[in-house]
UniProtKB/Swiss-Prot annotation:
GO CC terms, sorted: cytoplasm
Subcellular location: Cytoplasm
Main location: cytoplasm
Protein name: Ferric uptake regulation protein
Binding positions for Fe cation per the UniProt entry: 88, 90, 109, 123
PANTHER family referenced in this protein's UniProt entry, alphabetically: FERRIC UPTAKE REGULATION PROTEIN, ZINC UPTAKE REGULATION PROTEIN
GO molecular function: DNA-binding transcription factor activity; transcription cis-regulatory region binding; zinc ion binding
Length: 138
């Protein structure tokens, strides 16, 4: 997803377009990895001195509710990234830097065979570890 797609979702849901929201979305698009709310606040503070953590967090949850961003828990805190919308896939997430890699393999058919008496409505697979770059820099 890019910033314009995200802004369209906001407008289609009757929400206001603001420069702050656009700039927040730009951070996600440019960095393209999982980020915590504090990182977003610090980046936003350069152009919007004194922006509150509450303002950032409210917008993050709004974006998440609209499907603009995804979230995961990493190192005991919520982290967010721009939503992937191109095709069904899963992610490898680096525990150090938050970088993600797409996993095109989906094990849902094997899981359905393993659990034949359940109804699966949805699924999300995240694999955690340390990326090559972080391993080299260790």
């Amino acid at each position: 997803m890019n910033t314009n797609d995200a802004i369209k979702i906001l407008k289609d849901n009757g929400l206001k377009y603001t420069d702050k929201r656009k700039d927040m979305l730009d951070i996600f698009v440019e960095e393209d990895k999982y980020l915590n709310a504090k990182h977003i606040q610090q980046k936003m503070d350069k152009d919007y001195p004194g922006i509150s953590f509450d303002t950032v967090y409210r917008n993050l949850h709004l974006f998440k509710d609209l499907g603009i961003i995804e979230s995961t828990e990493l190192e005991g805190e919520m982290k967010f990234r721009i939503a992937c919308t191109n095709h069904h896939h899963h992610h490898f997430i680096c525990e150090n830097c938050g970088d993600t890699k797409v996993i095109d393999f989906c094990p849902i058919e094997q899981i359905k065979q393993y659990l034949p008496n359940v109804t699966i409505h949805t699924h999300k697979l995240e694999v955690y570890g340390v990326c090559e770059s972080c391993q080299k820099n260790a």
